[in-house]
Amino acid sequence: MGKKKYGQKWIVIWTSTLLILFFSYSFAFSRTVTQLIPTLTITEEYNDNYFQTENNTQEEYITSYGLGFSAGFLYKKINLYLGYNPEYRDYKNLDDRDGFEHYVSLDGEFNPSKYTNINARLAYTTKDDKESGETWENTAAIYGDTQFTQNTNLDYSHFYSKSFDQQLRTGTYNEHELNRATVGITNQFGKKDRMGLNFSYELDDYKNSNADGYTRYNPSGFITYWITPLNGLDSQIAYRNTDFDESFDDIETYTGHIRYLRKFSELFDGYLKYRHSYSQRDSGDHHIYHPSVGFDWETGTDSHISLGIGILFSEWDNDNDDSNDLFFEMDAYKIFHFSKRGSLSITGSSGYSEAGDDAASLGYNLYYKAGLKLNYQMQKRLSSNLFGSYQRDEFPESDIDRTDNIITLGGGLSWSPLQWLRLNLSYAHTDFDTNTSQRGDYTENKVIFSVRFIPSQPVWPTPESSRQSLENEIYN
């Protein structure tokens, strides 16, 4: 209890200090825009399988009352946005979980020079329950890019997360910290000719001993070169070292590919590709030979569709069986605007690695993910959406031999009968199926209805549609 009170006290002091700074700047600079807006939100949530179990499912109703504040500070090359949302949650069946929770977020956009852009975000919650069904996450992130010369750019980022969530491998809930740092440099030496180097470092540390904890670093390089206006090549090489906290079976992986590109139009290329992967570990080496054919369709600045088909030839130096498997390559994101009122967003990806991010200890992993979301403006103040997604994870090593399938379907309505009043209704259905004994199948239905009172539009910018925001909504 003492730590919780200390955390709440720290949040109040931190928030008050930031607000004082915001208002101080607003008087100091005539061009500064500062805004403080209170909001009131009442939410009712129903879940027919709160603990996501196969048997003995638990229904739960949760009523939330939130009084939040948002503040914006805009001045020349600096934009800051602060959100503070205290909330009281009332559980119908799990009475011991009733209580207040506090959420604080701080977003910043900085342009320290003409050639440098930096974005930062902090998100903190006082929620610290460590019980099944509860999830929370505290994050801090910074992303930046600097243009060194007319043709050379440097990108850099750091992401930190401390969370309590459900583990893919076992279905149990665990607390862990994730640190991820990346840096990359790219040089463009022709209209479509590029080359670059990247490096990433990642640490996933569990509070209690866990087989999925790891440390990883990954240098890589790439080049794309068009020999003629219609014929080109691209290639990439990478090294990946994964060091497990609870195992001596660490993995070193060397990968590389080369593609022949044939341009059919300004936005459409076909390709022939060969990729090779070689992994070393104490339990046995692994070779993957992967020829494929496909196409790249650049549909816009931030959207593209890349599809291919090939065969994975796997050779193992252990008890795992060699295999020849058909594999569909997929990397797609596109928004189709079919009318002034409606749009369809699609996303999809596939891949394979010797140790995945979400269940590293399960070893060699193949995955497919695809989803879509349909948005439609039914009336001026009434909008709707429908979404669906499918995820498949395969862990084919002989001592694991596991396949997980997740189907998610849902939709929602948003109605603003008055400028200061918003009503939202959403529904989501999740079906999880697995062939492992480590965790059970489950289905879950969740309904959320909320009423929000907001006196005016905040200066907080409306987030632009992005692939990451779409996938966060339809996959999670």
Task: Indicate residue ranges for each PLM-predicted region.
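N-terminal secretory signal peptides that target proteins for export/translocation
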Residues: 1-8
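Generic short amphipathic/hydrophobic targeting helices enriched at N-termini
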Residues: 8-9, 16
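Bacterial N-terminal signal peptides
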Residues: 14-25
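Gram-negative and organellar
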Residues: 29-476
